[in-house]
Amino acid sequence: MKNLITDIEGILVGCAEDHRFSTGVTILSGPNPFTAAVDVRGGGAGTRETEILKLESSIGRVDAIVLSGGSAFGLDASSEVQKLLLEEGKGYKVKDHSIPLVSSAVIFDLIQSDNYWENNVSIWRILANKAYKNLSDNFLLGSKGAGYGANTATVKGGQGSASSEVELLSLIHI
């Protein structure tokens, strides 16, 4: 075990950063859909498709989770991941359609710039594309991916990961 989320079989992580804008993207995905859960807190949480991660959701799985800087602009990263998954034929099957299920959350890491586009493509789409191509069972912690521009008022943040094995119990109810 590497004490990373990728210790869970089938989970891969990809990261990409843009040093010019002090922002980044982290993607969790894999060859198959996986089960995840969410607890959204705060009054201004920037999220997309987190409802499908709630325990009462009828779907119960996702094709990817995208964590991004960029505040609301960063939600664009999940659209790129959804496009890439669709190109691979992945997604929730509805009749003749596939709908890749991508949940995402963003942090505020914007610096002094209002030009977050290259050739009319948002930098978060570009970063998502790079991160998706970097999917691996090994990734760096700290100021990488979505954690690249993370900070509080006075303390630099980053991304972390951990894993733990829990022995499953068999319960019999009589």
Go through the PLM ranges and name each one:
Residues 1-40:
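N-terminal amphipathic/basic leader segments beginning at the initiator methionine
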Residues 2-3, 12-17, 53-56, 90-92, ...:
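A generic local secondary-structure boundary/capping motif
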Residues 4-7, 15, 38-40, 94-95, ...:
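General beta-strand structural signal in soluble alpha/beta enzymes
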Residues 39-59:
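Glycine-rich oxoanion-binding loops at beta->alpha junctions
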Residues 63-64, 70-143:
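A generic, well-ordered mixed alpha/beta core segment in the N-terminal half of proteins
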Residues 136-158:
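Intrinsically disordered, low-complexity linker/loop segments enriched in Gly/Pro
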Residues 172-174:
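Conserved small/polar residues in nucleotide/adenosyl-binding loops
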